[in-house]
Amino acid sequence: YLERRLGVAPKVDLKLPIIPLGVDSSRYAADAEARARLRKHIGAAEEDFVILFLGRFTFHAKAHPVPMYLAAEGVARRLQDRKVHFVMAGQAPNETIYQSYLDSAAAYTEKASVHFVDGQDDDLVHASWQGADAFLSLSDNIQETFGLTPIEAMAAGLPAVVSDWDGYKDTIVDGETGFRIPTVTPSGGDGFEYAYLYQSGRDNYDRFVG
């Protein structure tokens, strides 16, 4: 980047190793009681298949839920002999957005059961990690620079299905530590108008990243 921007190849002797964010894996060790607690909370039997998403409930600054609802519904239609539950753990910034999540869940799922869990309830979040069978996060916003939840999913022993996007590319090795779903981005130049609105101060950062 510096060479392209300045026209001079920089010589940097200082090494800057990347030390990613980590988790205390002992907190995610198998906990049968917590697993049973989550399944009782959502009405899931032990043989049912539970998918977990954990993150902010915001369309523009985390992940649009509809692709995840469709994915859960697709699994439910394939697993004819097992009931599928999709647990959405997190919080919405306001009641209007939360209601839109509820409405879209009802509109896009029929066989899969969608459950919403308070992301500020530490005990229930812990139980969610333990009670799930798979982790799903199709993040699609430009501020997802790292993404800690796939690391937590791996610590909990859950197979992770994530979008092939931004920081998730660094934490999930496709086919080895999880599965990355291909994404599509606009062609170069398409974002000029949005960048201009942000740079000129007409849009704030929150709107820009959405």
Which residues fall in each region the model found?
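Conserved catalytic-core segment of nucleotide-activated headgroup transferases in glycan assembly
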Residues: 7, 21-119
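Short alpha-helical donor nucleotide-sugar binding micro-motif in glycosyltransferases
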Residues: 119-122, 127-132
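Helix-loop-beta element that forms the nucleotide-linked donor phosphate-binding surface
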Residues: 1-23
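Short glycine/serine-rich donor-binding loops of glycosyltransferases
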Residues: 147-150, 168
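Acidic donor-binding loop of glycosyltransferase active sites
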Residues: 130-145, 158
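Short hydrophobic beta-strand element within catalytic cores of glycosyltransferases
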Residues: 159-162, 172, 179
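A short acidic/histidine/glycine-rich donor-binding loop in glycosyltransferase catalytic cores
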Residues: 176-189, 196-203, 207
